[in-house]
């Protein structure tokens, strides 16, 4: 059975755990519609990505 050779110091333990925290999602304002969207993601309402039409826009029902 594998066991640690040395005790993990509180500093090392804290540095390892620092990546475990939840981070708030970032949003940017869309240039065309002015709505908030995730960066590097397609705007599903308009179907635009980086100034190009990549999807057909959704119809509002």
Swiss-Prot record:
Provide GO CC annotations from the record: large ribosomal subunit
MF terms per GO, please?
structural constituent of ribosome
Q: Where is the composition biased (Basic residues)?
A: 1-16
Region feature Disordered, mapped onto this chain: 1-41
Q: Report the Pfam families cross-referenced here.
A: Ribosomal_L32p (PF01783)
Q: Which InterPro entries match?
A: Ribosomal_bL32, Ribosomal_bL32_bact, Ribosomal_zn-bd
Q: Which family does it belong to?
A: Belongs to the bacterial ribosomal protein bL32 family.
- Name of the protein: Large ribosomal subunit protein bL32
Q: Which organism is it from?
A: Rhizobium rhizogenes (strain K84 / ATCC BAA-868)
User: What high-level taxonomic lineage is stated for the organism?
Assistant: Bacteria, Pseudomonadati, Pseudomonadota, Alphaproteobacteria, Hyphomicrobiales
> By which gene is this protein encoded?
rpmF
